[in-house]
Design a protein with these regions (language model features):
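Gram-negative outer-membrane beta-barrel domains
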Residues: 2-269
């Protein structure tokens, strides 16, 4: 009987050992690699072109001056001459450099544009109005020198900018109606200046490849006021030479395309 119990115990232990051996250890499986997303890096030099439209509000004020003609007693001319909007197309190019820290993007840029902004209004000063004189403005060039700060979402960048602005302005006093012997459109006086001011702007830019991006930008130029010398035709009205105080600001909207040099795409985990 004892032998029978001992044999049964040995058989039971053998069966348990066999079951444990059959289970075995689970094989080791390597964890999957983390997903890597490509993050666009805005750092680097870039060059580009832009085009769009602009409009400028111009207000003229004649600085008091005396007209002394032998046929009549001397008299003083002064006062506001009215305002007009000079508008038209603009196109040019830009060059700059950006560097990125986390999602923040900083940059500097220089931009130069050709422009054809023109506008006019009849003078509201009685003496000039009686002489059929109107004022005309033309802005033929502008430049911006700015710093930028922006925030990026991968290949999308929103930014603000600010800095210095410069414009090339030309002014004319012309006949809006004939005044014998002079025809309509005859230019009686001219003036010009290079004016400096400030600029602030906002824009959005999208990189559609590693190096190419497109943007839409709005800028407001604060050009203040400036005194301009108006010189009349020496044959007809040399005694009318005088100074005009002209106030000016400019709004500009442009579409832009940029090519960025180098600047690798950075892996983002």
């Amino acid at each position: 009987m004892i032998r029978l119990s001992l044999a049964a115990s040995i058989l039971a232990l053998g069966a348990m050992s066999a079951s444990a051996a059959d289970l075995g250890a689970r094989p080791y499986t390597k964890a999957p690699a983390p997903i890597v997303a490509a993050a666009y890096d805005w750092s680097g030099f870039y060059i580009g072109a832009n085009g769009g439209g602009a409009w400028s509000r111009k207000c003229w004020d004649t600085v008091p001056f005396t007209i002394d003609i032998q046929a009549i007693p001397p008299f003083t001319v002064a006062g506001p001459e009215g305002c007009h909007t000079a508008s038209g197309p603009t196109a040019g190019g830009q060059i700059g450099y950006r560097w990125q820290a986390a999602a923040w993007v900083f940059g500097i840029e220089a931009q130069g544009n050709w422009a054809d902004l023109t506008g006019s209004n009849p003078s509201t000063i009685p003496f000039f109005a009686a002489s059929n004189l109107a004022n005309r403005t033309k802005i033929d060039a502008s430049g911006l020198f700015t710093g930028q700060i922006g925030y990026s979402w991968n290949s999308l960048l929103l930014y603000v900018k600010g800095g210095a602005a410069v414009t090339s302005d030309k002014y004319e006093a012309f006949l809006f109606a004939p005044q014998a012997p002079l025809p309509t459109g005859f230019v009686e006086a001219r003036g010009s200046e290079t004016r400096w001011g400030g600029v602030v702007g906002i824009g959005g830019e999208y990189a559609f490849t590693r190096n190419w991006s497109v943007a839409l930008e709005y800028d407001h130029l604060f050009m203040g006021d400036s005194t301009v010398r108006m010189t009349f035709d020496p044959v007809f009205n040399p005694v009318l030479n005088h100074n005009v105080r002209i106030r000016q600001d400019i709004d500009m909207v442009t579409a832009r395309i940029n090519y960025r040099f180098g600047g690798p795409v950075v892996a983002k985990y």
